[in-house]
């Protein structure tokens, strides 16, 4: 065990040691070590996770005869239930696409999609800042890959030009809203680039955009009127939609390839039908949350201005607002100070973010009030 203890000691010396906190959730507040704090670190962007009215309406429709609490199997064996197909059809219909496929989590989706759809003769070109789950999926693909500079589409174009005709297919991989900086990919440019090169496919992760952007809450692709142009549009139900699981929107051919070749789908026990039914309930109502989306944007614009005034660094265009401090020690100290002031703010350090860009990732939710965010900004 000595070697493992040494690894932990090294993490501690670098201010990178992590532990799982004991938390009590009370709506938009969190209690930790007897301190009640406004939760500034949640991905519950629309504030639906603690909405008692939604929860009550969902439960009442069953009259005590609830869907099963377990699927007990993979969907390809005996773990498929009608509610899965119902949700896939609803998602596909809302996106006006041919097909949709459900997954247990966003991590499962990103881990399995690329290995299922590539060969050793394929190429993957990924934004430098894509999520760790995408990086893990790329590594498992065992094909050639390059990471283009973050949102640098000239660099991406150069990589595409250099590799024309060398591979059987090319996947461009990006997030729409980036989870640590809160900035947004230019999906229009990516679609244009994809169309310029043969056998090139665009894979966009909308985990932090679904629910929050677009007239119907379908994400940046909806906002930019590009849903039909993106080959694989992936999102999660576990953030703004207050549930669990993930989806991919695509054509029927790609869906069938994933069903036949995607290991995390084939070899995982499916989500409980009860959870899938809750997801259906929320997703069906997604267009109704326009007031929450508007309020969240107002809060976000205010906080972005306040943080930019203090740090002069503001890549964000969204409700994810990075307060970049640089060093681990300063970031840990600031997070502890803000927690002492009644705000649950968490430090984000390497390897989650690049070296010397440690930050507090501020994440706003629609159930916060304007006064609460103003009072928080005054503490910065």
Curated annotation (Swiss-Prot):
This is Putative 8-amino-7-oxononanoate synthase. Catalyzes the decarboxylative condensation of pimeloyl-[acyl-carrier protein] and L-alanine to produce 8-amino-7-oxononanoate (AON), [acyl-carrier protein], and carbon dioxide. Substrate binds at residues 18, 131, 352. Pyridoxal 5'-phosphate binds at residues 106-107, 179, 205-208, 236-239. The keyword Transferase applies. SUPFAM superfamilies: PLP-dependent transferases (SSF53383). Its cofactor is pyridoxal 5'-phosphate. It holds the Pfam family Aminotran_1_2. It comes from Neisseria gonorrhoeae (strain NCCP11945). Homodimer. The keyword Phosphoprotein does not apply. It catalyses: 6-carboxyhexanoyl-[ACP] + L-alanine + H(+) = (8S)-8-amino-7-oxononanoate + holo-[ACP] + CO2. Pathway: Cofactor biosynthesis; biotin biosynthesis. Keywords: Biotin biosynthesis, Pyridoxal phosphate, Transferase. Its EC number is 2.3.1.47. The modification N6-(pyridoxal phosphate)lysine is found at residue 239. Belongs to the class-II pyridoxal-phosphate-dependent aminotransferase family. BioF subfamily.
């Amino acid at each position: 065990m000595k070697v493992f203890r040494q690894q932990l000691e090294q993490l501690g010396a670098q201010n990178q040691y992590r532990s799982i906190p004991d938390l009590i959730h009370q709506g938009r507040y969190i209690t930790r070590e007897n301190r009640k704090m406004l939760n500034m670190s949640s991905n519950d962007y629309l504030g639906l996770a603690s909405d008692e009215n939604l929860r009550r309406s969902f439960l009442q429709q069953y009259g005590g005869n609830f869907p099963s609490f377990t699927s007990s199997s993979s969907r390809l064996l005996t773990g498929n239930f009608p509610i899965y197909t119902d949700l896939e059809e609803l998602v596909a219909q809302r996106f006006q696409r041919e097909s949709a496929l459900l997954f247990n989590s966003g991590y499962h989706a990103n881990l399995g999609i690329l290995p299922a759809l590539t060969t050793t003769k394929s190429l993957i070109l990924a934004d430098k800042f894509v999520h760790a789950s995408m990086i893990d999926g790329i590594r498992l693909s065992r094909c050639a890959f390059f990471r283009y500079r973050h949102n640098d589409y000239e660099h991406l174009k150069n990589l595409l030009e250099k590799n024309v005709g060398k591979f059987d297919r090319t996947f461009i991989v990006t997030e729409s809203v980036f989870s640590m900086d809160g900035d947004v990919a230019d999906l229009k440019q990516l679609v244009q680039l994809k169309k310029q090169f043969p056998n090139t496919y665009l894979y966009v992760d909308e985990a932090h955009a679904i629910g929050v952007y677009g007239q119907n809450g379908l994400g940046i692709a909806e906002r930019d009127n590009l849903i039909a142009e993106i080959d694989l549009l992936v999102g999660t139900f576990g953030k703004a939609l207050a549930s669990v699981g993930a989806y991919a929107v695509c054509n029927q051919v790609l869906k069938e390839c994933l069903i036949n070749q995607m290991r995390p789908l084939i070899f995982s026990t499916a989500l409980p039908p009860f959870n899938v039914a809750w997801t259906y309930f929320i997703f069906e109502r997604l267009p109704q949350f326009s007031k929450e989306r508007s309020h969240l944007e107002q809060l976000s614009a205010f906080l972005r201005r306040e943080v930019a005034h203090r740090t002069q660094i503001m890549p964000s265009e969204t409700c994810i607002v990075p307060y970049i401090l640089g060093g681990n020690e300063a970031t840990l100290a600031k997070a502890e100070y803000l927690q002492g002031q009644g705000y649950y703010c968490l430090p984000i350090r390497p390897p989650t973010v690049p070296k010397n860009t440690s930050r507090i990732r501020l994440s706003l939710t629609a159930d916060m009030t304007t006064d609460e965010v103003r009072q928080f900004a005054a503490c910065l």
